[in-house]
Amino acid sequence: MQSNISIYVLTVIGSCFYNPFILTYECRDDCCNGRYGPVPAPWKVLNCTKTGPGCPDSGYLLTTSENKTYCITGNETDKGNYPQTIGAIFPNCSGMNVGAGRLITRMLEEYPRGKSPSNNSINNIKISC
């Protein structure tokens, strides 16, 4: 009886270690792996990298100065306070701003000569998902 339990335990452990789901992308550093969250402030982002081939979640990995990694995708641009600045500041994130599923569209307002705009309306940014 004890040997049957041991074989069962080894079988369960073995199937966990050789699960193709885990081996393909679950633990890869170049996939999102559930690292979603609010978009960090742009001055805290040190690096921006597109997710790797074969990842189930296409997006961009933002690494911050606090050594945290966040993944943002087209459906997540409304999270955080700074999504509109990421593509402008980091050139390797510029792919987020093109194509039918682009993340950001900008609408610039015109102002009468000699009148300075308020801080709230310098760039009227519209986020489109």
Curated annotation (Swiss-Prot):
GO molecular function term, any single one: chemokine activity
Keyword rRNA-binding: no
Keywords assigned by UniProt, alphabetized: Cytokine
Tagged with keyword Oxidoreductase: no
A GO CC term attached to the entry: extracellular space
GO biological process, one term: immune response
Domain of life from the UniProt record: Viruses
Record family assignment: Belongs to the intercrine beta (chemokine CC) family. Highly divergent.
Stated name of the protein: Putative CC-type chemokine FPV061
Organism from which the protein derives: Fowlpox virus (strain NVSL)
